Amino acid sequence: MQKTIRIIGIDPGLRRTGWGVIDTLGNSLRFVASGTVTSDGDMDLASRLCQLHDGLAEIVHSHQPDEAAVEQTFVNKDAVATLKLGQARGIAMLVPARAGLPVFEYAPNAVKKAVIGVGHGEKQQIHMMLKILMPKAEFKGNDAADALAIAICHAHNRGGDRMRRLLAAG
């Protein structure tokens, strides 16, 4: 008998980190919750990272996911912004890992391909497919929608990921 698996998807960002929680049983997906954790742009970097940490820790504690999926970052022309995003991503990976969850990573193109069928697409296409895949899904803004898409990507890929990890562990 299959067990329902609760997945949290995290879309890291220093200003806004999106999160989305879904339940998956076999091929079925069920929306649980979504939102964003924000940091105060007037605060120093360390304080902002603490805000992200504390907010994500509360979400993980309250929703009790079984697995986490985090979007990989891309390198842009602004090296300072890329480094800050990398630090926010570190928090996004640390929080579920410290809670004992396995953490999986997905490239943005893989997330889009899992949700809309192609690796390059518009935000509106993601929003539309989220509503088709999970009609009861509620999300405010692109960050929460992206986080739900990341969770769905993991739900579609989790069997293969688990097998690869077992084989690598030897």
Swiss-Prot record:
Record-annotated residues binding Mg(2+) 2? 71
Q: State which Enzyme Commission number(s) the record gives.
A: 3.1.21.10
> Residues in the active site?
11, 71, 143
Report residues binding Mg(2+) 1: 11, 143
CDD domains according to UniProt: RuvC
Q: Name one GO biological process term.
A: DNA recombination
What are its cofactors? Mg(2+)
Protein's UniProt keywords contain Nucleotide-binding: no
| Compartments in which it is found | Cytoplasm
For this protein, the record's InterPro entries field holds: RNaseH-like_sf, RNaseH_sf, X-over_junc_endoDNase_Mg_BS, X-over_junc_endoDNase_RuvC
Which Gene3D superfamilies did the record assign? Ribonuclease H-like superfamily/Ribonuclease H
The UniProt entry's GO CC annotations, sorted and at most eight, read: cytoplasm; Holliday junction resolvase complex
- Asked if the keyword Iron belongs to this entry, the reply reads no
Q: Name one GO molecular function term.
A: crossover junction DNA endonuclease activity
Keywords tagged on the record: Cytoplasm, DNA damage, DNA recombination, DNA repair, DNA-binding, Endonuclease, Hydrolase, Magnesium, Metal-binding, Nuclease
Q: How does it assemble?
A: Homodimer which binds Holliday junction (HJ) DNA. The HJ becomes 2-fold symmetrical on binding to RuvC with unstacked arms; it has a different conformation from HJ DNA in complex with RuvA. In the full resolvosome a probable DNA-RuvA(4)-RuvB(12)-RuvC(2) complex forms which resolves the HJ.
Which HAMAP family would you find in this protein's record? RuvC
Any idea what job this protein has? Answer: The RuvA-RuvB-RuvC complex processes Holliday junction (HJ) DNA during genetic recombination and DNA repair. Endonuclease that resolves HJ intermediates. Cleaves cruciform DNA by making single-stranded nicks across the HJ at symmetrical positions within the homologous arms, yielding a 5'-phosphate and a 3'-hydroxyl group; requires a central core of homology in the junction. The consensus cleavage sequence is 5'-(A/T)TT(C/G)-3'. Cleavage occurs on the 3'-side of the TT dinucleotide at the point of strand exchange.
Family note: Belongs to the RuvC family.
- Name the record gives this protein: Crossover junction endodeoxyribonuclease RuvC
Q: What is the lineage of its organism?
A: Bacteria, Pseudomonadati, Pseudomonadota, Alphaproteobacteria, Hyphomicrobiales
